[in-house]
UniProtKB/Swiss-Prot annotation:
Key words of the record: Cell adhesion, Cell membrane, Disulfide bond, Glycoprotein, Immunoglobulin domain, Membrane, Repeat, Transmembrane, Transmembrane helix
Example of a GO cellular component annotation carried by this entry: cell surface
Domain Fibronectin type-III, chain residue ranges per copy: 427-521, 527-617, 622-716, 726-816, 841-937, 942-1039
Residue intervals on the Extracellular side: 1-1090
Listed Basic and acidic residues bias regions: 1037-1046
CDD domains: FN3 (cd00063), IgI_1_Neogenin_like (cd05722), IgI_4_Neogenin_like (cd05723)
Subcellular location(s) of the protein: Cell membrane
Main location (coarse class): membrane
Record-stated family: Belongs to the immunoglobulin superfamily. DCC family.
Name of protein: Neogenin
Residue ranges of the region described as Disordered: 1026-1082, 1123-1145, 1159-1191, 1220-1339
Cystine pairs: C40-C95, C139-C187, C236-C286, C328-C376
PROSITE patterns from the UniProt entry: FN3 (PS50853), IG_LIKE (PS50835)
Length: 1443
């Protein structure tokens, strides 16, 4: 057959051929001598050839006289032969249909069963039955013969109906017997040939008896197993008088048999279930009852299901060398087994034919001979079934037609592409195995000579075992990839590889075969056999094992692992021999043990765990919370709780109670109770106080006992069937802050009173309630308000309830009344009774946070002695909850110590805790609340709802949105966005974009058009990184928008000098490791116009500086010359020419408000470097002269921009009226910075990108790199540009600054300790504002602002206040080991900012002296005054920064 033409070559594609069975053979039961037909019929356009198999062997029907093939394909067997030693016809038959050009298919297997010789295993016997009862006559035969059994009554055939019923076994049931049922019965087997008769037996019908007869089962139901669709019969024959009535239940529910289609009663009580289904499985109960009694009998019904297909194999197209999978899903009961057949022959699993996922067939490395029909044959105990599919292998140049989803593995037709005419690629070059392991090999190669770039080439790697002609294929995952990993190989096996390149025209030449052998697999030891563990004592276990049977090399040692059951942590110990005894274990505790053997290659296979429990011992602790309650005059009830968990040391078998009279401590009585937690001690004396203690027992003995606890029996047996009566009297005596309450008991002394309840409150007695002992007769209510009206109520109570209250009121005395002495209390007779007041709540509750899920609660108990030792049976209850969500319920736990470890809490969650104490039946109120917040934990869930959208109008810009993790476990401090074009790439190969934690959206720019990108997001808190989100795919649009040119220019001009670098607010730094910025910088001016402006400003500035410098130099006084000459004589001979050609323009101190230019002292350096400090007005003023450092800026510039928060900065606004503004040569900055000094060890550290939400991240200390390294107007030669970026950060070396700090008259500090670099923040502030900055005033006019001044010895300069410059001077490229910089803002600061002393310019009255001749020097007294003035200015600025 031919089908549609291939879209690749136009050749005709063969279609699948319908080929299947119309009728398949079924199981047959036959008898000797009968004829049998096994039906079989198949369909195919080409008439198939039919053959038959018996027991897996083809039958030769040509020479067989008894078997013949009918025209429709059925098999006829004439005169079935069957004897004891010759059974040629019985067996399993299978029909095989073959079409020569296609293949073969086989039918299901059918069983032919031949009934055996007729014989009876039991025969009818004489029996009698009462009229109306049911009778049964046995005739047991083989199961095969049961269908051939019939019955005769008085030698006449017996007709069967619902009352007279034949069981499947052949027995006869007669229900509701009548007189006509009496007679002689026999059963007959008619299985062909002469019938075989059983013996005759008489059935007698008896009249009803005069007395009732007991019910008895004549035949009970027995459990059955049936196949779906069969009938099931549960016989149930009961006899007795009166005649019993039989009914049935299924799984305890009444079974309705009337009007049911499938359930019916036969012969008076037997249950018939027709067409059994799986829903019929269960327990069936036959219930027979009459007026006198009821009897029951049960039986189970199990149902088996033949195999059924849930998923049938599908037809598959494939190419040679591909891997395919035929899927087959079956069900049945018992679970079916599956085998596969190809063209009628069973498929034997091998390296290339594998059974995967239980039932599926995987064929690896297809070859042409694999074509044909594949059948999945499922079989269980009750049947079999088959389903098939066709495999067609196409030529490599023929594309696989589009079909419903077929089961192809990863090696599909991805290597095929629509073929066009053109040159094909040559063979790939230099195919080598770069990594060879035991089960995988990595291959790499070079592109073909015909296509050296190879960007559009894909590759197919064909490989096979050496000596086997079945090749498999693996394709590269993306175009241009020149390596592949071949996995699932066999160890120590030689494989042959070849690589074929493919372009849009088709497959090219194959590379030369490459033979590679996989590594042999390391032979590790197997599991140690016969591992055994037995407990030697309550705290030790001995483990033994034998030497592993497998392994390569000598066993070096063993490692024994053991773990307490229910715990997560496993412990281990190294063992040299074959046994070990572990000590120090817990008593009567289950432990699991396993052993791992080690050889020179490492650990082997672990043994299975063996579990053993340590031996029991006497309990190690006493029972808890023993309470006593007098029941009457002769008995006391004891209640207690078991010893604490972990102290039982075995199974508690009982409790030993010891008690004695308090007056006779030597006379002790013992009572042994069971495992219950209470005991009533009877036979006690009236009105006598007894001591009790209790101890727990195990089979090993008795553990420690509790402390003695006392209780007193009643004087007389009182009534506790009703509540007590009202107390006979109530008296109150108010004091200033307390009221003394006294009372007398109820007049009726015959009712039990177990205590009194006192209620009180201002205006109402229900505010507070106190319960006291029944012996108490007075109580002082404390902590009341003076001059307040209190209502007091008193009620007696017992176990039935509270009695009638008695009310009284009192007004506490005012504060002025100091008479607090109550004569009534003093003179009242003392009664030694237990403390009647309620227990005081614990105090000093504290919550100590230990981890992210654990908090330790501690408290104190004021009712204990000062040493806080617990000597009684009190216990504490700890409760805790969190208020999020609001309706959270309290959780509680009990403790017998003064601390408790609360575990299982949520990270970063605020909990509240309170404690109460309980002693016997008395409990305190809850203590005051303590709070604690658990520590943070790394996020345990990824950010959610990650979405990616394209920015409108900018197809190369995308916007990533997300939501915080549902389990953040702390404050999210940042996110990291990973993106890549290869979802399978290693994570370290993905591009990252850090984002601050308060942002849930981020833009990524300069992406490639029409390219799929994959995005993942990872959240971070103070504890670390959380898990990554699932990859989200987004394909960028195909079309380019109108802003393409600015984007392209921005990314393409880096390093070419075509336009100045734009450092405006829109500047976005590049990705880490990328040379092109993912941003869209734009310039408000045309690049040519901007260049002209920059050059003009630079020239004008140089001219002005030169003129001012010459003017200042000529006014230097001769006295200054003498001073400098004296300094030179000490430091060495430094000649300094005063020629005009050597004069450099001095740095100028610019008073922004006074608009004055003040020269600073001249530097002694031989080659001083000039630095201008103009006043920037807006962000446009700081455009650099040249953008040759463009690429460096891209690499170094920090993208962290934004407005600083007010609370993170000190303010200088309050001092602006007193101090002149000090400007920096950079872009506009926030008006109120904090200036702090930080040592920066390296300026080339890789920096991360941060979002522009705020100036500084509280969790990072990344360097803020300088934006514009050049002041406006500074002229630079081409030779200076090479190190332009670095020179701004570098400190002058010793070559350019020969006057080092070791010189006594030097005017500058050591470069390593004093030099600084200004690191600019980003620019997003208002352009009209300027940054107030600080300058250090040097002592020489030509010295740069970068070099701080050091006062001469003996000056008033304070050395404890460091002077930090804000701008370094330019210097040639020299290595700098350490640079100290002054940074703006709170950049990663973890401590208060260091005080910075910044001297200001001198006052106006000093102008004349400063403008004298440059060769002059200060007088000593003038220097002293100047230094004192500088010191005052530095202290002022220090006060400002610390404020």
């Amino acid at each position: 057959r031919s089908g549609p033409r291939s879209p690749l070559t136009g050749s005709v594609v063969r279609t699948f051929t319908p080929f299947y069975f119309l009728v398949e053979p079924m199981d047959i039961l036959s008898v000797r001598g009968a004829s049998v037909i096994m039906n079989c019929s198949s369909y195919c356009e080409t008439p198939p050839k039919i053959e038959w198999k018996k027991d897996g062997t083809l039958l030769n029907l040509v020479s067989d006289d008894r078997r013949q093939l009918l025209p429709d394909g059925s098999l006829l067997i004439n005169s079935v032969v069957h004897s004891k030693h010759n059974k040629p016809d019985e067996g399993y038959y299978q029909c095989v249909a073959t079409v020569e050009s296609l293949g073969s298919i086989v039918s299901r297997t059918a069983k032919l069963t031949v009934a055996g010789l007729p014989r009876f295993t039991s025969q009818p016997e004489l029996s009698s039955v009462y009229k109306g009862n049911s009778a049964i006559l046995n005739c047991e035969v083989n199961v095969d013969l049961a269908p051939f059994v019939r019955w005769e009554q008085d030698r006449q055939p017996l007709s069967l109906d619902d009352r007279v019923f034949k069981l499947p076994s052949g027995a006869l049931l007669i229900g509701n017997a009548t007189d006509t049922d009496g007679g002689f019965y026999r059963c007959v087997i008619e299985s062909g040939g002469t019938p075989k008769y059983s013996e005759e037996a008489e059935l007698k019908i008896l009249p009803d008896p005069e007395e009732p007869q007991s019910l008895v089962f004549v035949r009970q139901p027995s459990s059955l197993t049936k196949v779906t669709g069969q009938n099931a019969v549960f016989p149930c024959v009961a006899g007795g008088f009166p005649t019993p009535y039989v009914r049935w239940t299924k799984n305890g529910e009444e079974l309705i048999t009337e009007d049911s289609e499938r359930f019916a009663l036969r012969a008076g009580g037997s249950l018939l279930i027709s067409d059994v289904t799986e829903e019929d499985v269960g327990t069936y109960t036959c219930i027979a009852d009459n007026e006198n009694e009821t009897i029951e009998a049960q039986a189970e019904l199990a149902v088996q299901v033949p195999p059924e297909f849930l998923k049938r194999p599908a037809n598959i197209y494939a190419h040679e060398s591909m891997d395919i999978v035929f899927e087959c899903e079956v069900t049945g009961k018992p679970t079916p087994t599956v085998k596969w057949v190809k063209n009628g022959d069973v498929v034997i699993p091998s390296d290339y034919f594998k059974i995967v996922k239980e039932h599926n067939l995987q064929v690896l490395g297809l070859v042409k001979s694999d074509e044909g029909f594949y059948q999945c044959i499922a079989e269980n105990d009750v049947g079999n079934a088959q389903a098939g599919a066709q495999l067609i292998i196409l030529d490599l140049d023929v594309a696989i037609p589009t079909l419903p989803p077929t089961s192809l593995t990863s090696a599909t037709n991805d290597h095929l592409a629509p073929a066009t005419t053109g040159p094909l690629p040559t063979a790939p070059r230099d195919v080598v195995a770069t990594l060879v392991s035991t089960r995988f090999i990595r291959l790499t190669w070079r592109t073909p000579v015909s296509d050296p770039q190879g960007d559009n080439l894909t590759y197919s790697i064909f490989y096979t075992k050496e000596g086997i002609n079945r090749e498999r294929v693996e394709n590269t995952s993306r175009p241009g990839e020149t390596q592949v990993m071949i996995q699932n190989l066999m160890p120590e096996t030689v494989y042959v590889f070849r690589v074929v390149a493919q372009n849009k025209h088709g497959h090219g030449e194959s590379s030369a075969p490459l033979k590679v052998a996989t590594q042999p697999e390391v032979q590790l030891p197997g599991p140690a056999p016969n591992i055994r563990a037995y407990a030697g004592s309550p705290t030790s276990v001995t483990v033994t094992w034998e030497t592993p049977l497998s392994g390569n090399g000598e066993i070096q040692n063993y490692k024994l692992y053991y773990m307490e059951k229910g715990q997560d942590s496993e412990q281990d110990v190294d063992v040299a021999g074959l046994s070990y005894t572990i000590t120090g274990l817990k008593k009567y505790t289950e432990y699991s043990f396993r052993v791992v053997a080690y050889n020179k290659h490492g650990p082997g296979v672990s043994t299975q765990d063996v579990v053993v429990r340590t031996l029991s011992d006497v309990p190690s602790a006493a029972p808890q919370n023993l309470t006593l309650e007098a029941r009457n005059s002769k008995s006391i009830m004891l209640h207690w709780q078991p010893p604490p968990a972990g102290t039982h040391s075995g199974q508690i078998t009982g409790y030993k109670i010891r008690y004695r009279k308090v007056s006779r401590k030597s006379d002790v009585t013992e009572s042994v109770g069971g495992t219950q937690l209470f005991q009533l001690i009877e036979g006690l004396e009236r009105g006598t106080e007894y001591n009790f203690r209790i101890a727990a027992m195990t089979v090993n003995g008795t553990g420690p006992a509790t402390d003695w606890v006392s209780a007193e029996t009643f004087e007389s047996d009182l009534d506790e069937s009703r509540v007590p009566e009202v107390p006979s009297s109530l008296h109150v005596r108010p004091l200033v802050t307390s009221i003394v309450v006294s009372w007398t008991p109820p007049e009726n002394q015959n009712i039990v009173v177990r205590g009194y309840a006192i209620g009180y409150g201002i205006g109402s007695p229900h505010a507070q309630t106190i319960k006291v002992d029944y012996k108490q007769r007075y109580y002082t209510i404390e902590n009341l308000d003076p001059s307040s009206h209190y209502v007091i109520t008193l009620k007696a109570f017992n176990n039935v309830g509270e009695g009638i209250p008695l009310y009284e009121s009192a007004v506490t005395r005012p504060h002025s009344d100091t008479s607090e002495v109550d004569l009534f209390v003093i003179n009242a007779p003392y009664t030694p009774v237990p403390d009647p007041s309620p227990m005081m709540p614990p105090v000093g509750v504290q919550a100590s946070i230990l981890s992210h899920d654990t908090i330790r609660i501690t408290w104190a108990d004021n009712s204990l002695p000062k040493n806080q030792k617990i000597t009684d049976a009190r216990y504490y209850t700890v409760r805790w909850k969190t208020n999020i969500p609001a309706n959270t319920k309290y959780k509680t736990a009990n403790a017998t110590t003064l601390s408790y470890l609360v575990t299982g809490l949520k990270p970063n969650t605020l909990y509240e805790f309170s404690v109460m104490v309980t002693k016997g039946r008395r409990s305190s109120t809850w203590s005051m609340t303590a709070h604690g917040t658990t520590f943070e934990l790394v996020p345990t869930s990824p950010p959610k709802d990650v979405t990616v959208v394209s920015k409108e109008g900018k197809p190369r810009t995308i916007i990533v949105n997300w939501q915080p993790p549902s389990e953040a476990n702390g404050k999210i401090t940042g996110y990291i966005i990973y993106y890549s074009t290869d979802v399978n790439a290693e994570i370290h190969d993905w591009v990252i974009e850090p984002v601050v934690g308060n942002r849930l959206t981020h833009q990524i720019q300069e992406l490639t058009l029409d390219t799929p990108y994959y995005f993942k997001i990872q959240a971070r808190n103070s504890k670390g990184m959380g898990p990554m989100s699932e990859a989200v795919q987004f394909r960028t649009p195909k079309a380019e928008s109108s802003d393409k040119m600015p984007n392209d220019q921005a990314s393409g001009s880096a390093g070419k000098g075509s336009r100045p670098v734009d450092v405006g607010p829109d500047y976005k730094p590049p990705l880490s490791g990328s040379n092109s910025p993912h941003g869209s910088p734009t310039s408000p001016l045309d690049s040519n116009m901007l260049l002209v402006i920059i050059v003009s400003v630079g020239v004008i500035t140089i001219v002005i500086v030169v003129i001012v410098a010459v003017f200042c130099t000529r006014r230097t006084t001769s006295h200054q010359k003498k001073k400098r000459a004296a300094c030179k004589s000490v430091n060495g001979s430094h000649k300094y020419k005063g020629n005009s050609k050597d004069v450099k323009p001095p740095d100028l101190w610019i008073h922004h408000e006074r608009l004055e230019l003040k020269p600073i002292d001249k530097s002694p350096d031989p080659n001083p470097i000039m630095t201008d400090t103009p006043i920037p007005r807006n962000s446009q003023d700081i455009t650099p002269v040249d953008n040759s450092m463009d690429s460096n800026i891209h690499q170094r510039r920090n993208s962290y921009r934004g407005h600083e928060s007010e609370d993170s900065m000190s303010t200088l606004a309050g001092r602006r009226g007193m101090r002149p503004k000090m400007m920096m040569p950079f872009d506009s900055q926030p008006p109120q910075p904090v200036i702090s000094a930080h040592p920066i060890h390296s300026l080339d550290n890789p920096h991360h990108h941060f979002h522009s939400g705020s100036l500084a991240s509280p969790t990072r200390s990344y360097l803020h790199h300088q934006v514009s390294p050049w002041p406006v107007g500074t002229s630079m030669s081409h030779s200076d540009r090479a190190n332009s970026t670095e020179s701004v950060r570098n400190t002058p070396s010793s070559d350019t600054m020969p006057a080092s700090s070791s010189q006594p008259c030097a005017d500058h500090q050591d470069p390593d300790s004093s030099s600084g670099a200004y690191l600019g923040s980003a620019q997003e502030e208002d352009a009209a504002q300027s940054l107030p900055t600080a300058h250090v005033r040097p002592s020489h006019p030509l010295k740069s602002f970068a070099v701080p001044a050091v006062p001469a010895a003996g000056s008033a300069y304070d050395p404890t206040l460091p002077s930090t410059p804000l701008l370094t001077q330019q210097a040639p490229s020299h290595p700098v080991h350490s640079v100290k910089t002054a940074s703006i803002g709170t950049l990663g600061r973890t401590r208060p900012p260091m005080p910075v002393v910044v001297p200001s310019a001198p006052d106006v009255q000093e102008t004349t002296r400063m403008l004298e001749d440059s060769e002059s020097s200060y007088e000593p007294d003038e220097l002293t005054k100047e230094m004192a003035h500088l010191e005052g200015l530095m202290k002022d600025l220090n006060a400002i920064t610390t404020a």
